[in-house]
Amino acid sequence: MGKSLYIAEKPSVAREFAKALKYDMKNKDGYMESQEAVVTWCVGHLVTMSYPEVYDEKYRRWSLDTIPFIPEEFKYEVIDSVKKQFGIVSGLLNREDVETIYVCTDSGREGEYIYRLVEQQAGVEGKVRKRVWIDSQTEEEILRGIREAKDLSAYDNLSDAAYLRAKEDYLMGINFSRALTLKYSYPIKNYLQTDKAVVSVGRVMTCVLGMVVNREREIREFVKIPFYRILLQVAIEGHECTFEWKATEESKYYQSPKIYKDNGFLEEKEADAFISFLQEEPKEEPVIRKIEKKKETKNPPLLYNLAELQNDCSKLFKISPDETLRIAQELYEKKLTTYPRTDARVLSTAVAKEIAKNIGGLKNYHVAAEYAAEILNKGSYRGIEKTRYVNDKQITDHYAIIPTGQGFGSLNSLHPASAKVYEIIVRRFLSVFYPAAVYQKISIGVQMKGETFTSGFKVLADPGYLKVAQNSFARKKTEEYTEEEKKEEVKEEACDASFMEALSALKKGMNLTAGELSKKEGETSPPKRYNSGSMILAMENAGQFIEDEELRAQIKGSGIGTSATRAEILKKLVHIKYLDLNKKTQIITPTLLGEMIYEVVAGAIRPLLDPRLTASWEKGLTLVASGEITEKEYMVKLDDFVTRRTNAVKQMNNQATLIHRFHYASQFYKK
């Protein structure tokens, strides 16, 4: 009987498979072996696409005469730095006594690509090939993955999408970077007084640059509008409460052009005149005209996917997206959490049925022990599969990031940043087994001289899930409001239960005692700059930038890049100095070079800056992976796009106009 060969993506994962198999494994050079099985590993990518000069030496020199470069058949080669390990893996794949190959690379598009390239380059034939697809690296999950492994051919569509993604990035990168560099490097070099300038272009990278530059320009062009709100102090049961004027239908200022959004005067003198009118004799006390009492519930948020985790870590801890991904990968490899590169924020039905194991394990984690025990004692995990936190239709490759309830031997060795990330994953997970938080809210409207003032009050009646979610550092508010929203929202004063009872006793028609009348100056605020976390979310939700409803519906679920690549793209843009990332605040801004590159692309291949195009390409890859369109159909469109756009750039002669654009942009970067 032949042996089984297990091939993982990296050595640490291979060791976990070897442990789970419980064979008497002997360490060899680049693999482990027992009488029954062999376990080996890649070290990330072992094979890559060949540079153009491998096809023909004429392509080594950049020239407009040799583009567009679109090979009929793509060439691949082993990466020099990992040739030894490739030789070992290739030899094992082709060993006569190896009968079955278990592909154990990461369960996703990129993991599939890593293995398929190795198999292609090694020329593997005549073997049974199985795909192990797992969501965590616990022993049970590894054994389940092996037991339920499907034939590798079931993942051929995913493999096609992986190959296409690489070809797309390769063709756009080589052709567009060469075309734009050859056409526009001179004006860039000349303007910046540098020795060389390469215009780096990428399907996703250039689109992200466009989003950041466009946001920066919105901020520059924003004209602030000052306004003056009118505030009234009212005494209620010994408390000084602030009420705010609003131009309701009864007001003489209703829909007046002098008013900004119903609650502020555009001119200070108008605000002063209004206050004088209210203070004129005979004075009036405010009379209660409206009291509304209601309960408001706040449900636990959905579970973390990678983008949401990166966003929260950026806001809470000022950790960059690539660092968050590194930590999430570390937690996964230490068996503490499930697979990190996921877009889903829900669980699968199958996982939901076994979720008590995850919760039970968390009784060994001091931060969560009390909550885990409470959930198990109350049985609140039962029926979770009937809630919004479980939805098989919203899962493509993997469910949300959750704790496994295992791996606690590694907890003490975690870096403090990793420990914090683990804690918020645990808290988010346990939150979904608690009820909604309940607020008692009262809004009061009073009238004085026919003008209305309102105020709102609330008390937390039942903390529900908040007692789990908002402890420790996680108490910081993770929702972001613009400054304008903060200024304009009707203020709801947090109050205690006894004062809420006093408020509840108030009745319509009752007189209250007026205190000071004052004006408060405010101003409209420009859009916020992206931070590293909000940028990741914007990339994930590219559809929000699309006004056409039909097109937005078509690309729903497709963002810019993937959960596995977004952080790396941001990192690259910072590395090549197109973007600047403030490490302390995580705020992202363009550099002068980045804005100049934006101008070059805008004048030559503008669609590359458009989230609609980038998201539609990503949607196409998803359709290939699901078998809805063929690899050939996708490739025809890709070839046509690259050919047309490259040839168009070759015919352009707009370099002189760029200097004016460069000069205009540079004024915003002078120190």
Residue ranges and their predicted role:
Residues 255-302, 310:
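Metal- or metallocofactor-binding catalytic centers and their adjacent structured scaffolds
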Residues 74, 87, 96, 137-234, ...:
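C-terminal or mid-to-C-terminal helical accessory/interaction module adjacent to the motor/catalytic core
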Residues 14-22, 116-117, 209-219, 427:
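Short active-site loop/helix that positions an aromatic residue
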